[in-house]
Amino acid sequence: MRHQLRIPLLSKPADQRKALLRGLTTQLIREGRVTTTKARAKALRNEAERMISLAKDGSLASRRRAIGYIYDKKLVHSLFEKAKERYGDREGGYTRIVRTVSRKGDNAQMAIIELV
């Protein structure tokens, strides 16, 4: 039972939802910004901030957890090198969600999520 779980379902089974969020997180860390739907951006924020917090910690266990989540191993190493200097003084709020115009085909609310 899913009582009081705050993770949005995104109209997908659990394995597809996890793969979608892993892919979006990898793309966000690689490129710095992603254009997606508002619901996906809100779900992505949680995962991306968790990965950046792991990178700030910098321990071997944190690195292994990040490698298990992010698809690109080299991207994990670069994230761990840059996270302390980029986000060292922040205690959270590493991402920003900006709403954009609705998608033409189905009128879905779109958003840009970017790293601060």
UniProtKB/Swiss-Prot annotation:
Signal peptide: none annotated. GO terms for biological process: translation. GO terms for molecular function: structural constituent of ribosome. The keyword Zinc does not apply. GO terms for cellular component: cytosolic large ribosomal subunit. Disulfide bonds: none annotated. InterPro entries: Ribosomal_bL17, Ribosomal_bL17_sf. The keyword Endoplasmic reticulum does not apply. Coiled coil: none annotated. Gene3D superfamilies: Ribosomal protein L17. Keywords: Ribonucleoprotein, Ribosomal protein. Belongs to the bacterial ribosomal protein bL17 family. Part of the 50S ribosomal subunit. Contacts protein L32. HAMAP family: Ribosomal_bL17 (MF_01368). This is Large ribosomal subunit protein bL17. It comes from Prochlorococcus marinus (strain MIT 9215). The lineage of its organism: Bacteria, Bacillati, Cyanobacteriota, Cyanophyceae, Synechococcales. The gene is rplQ.
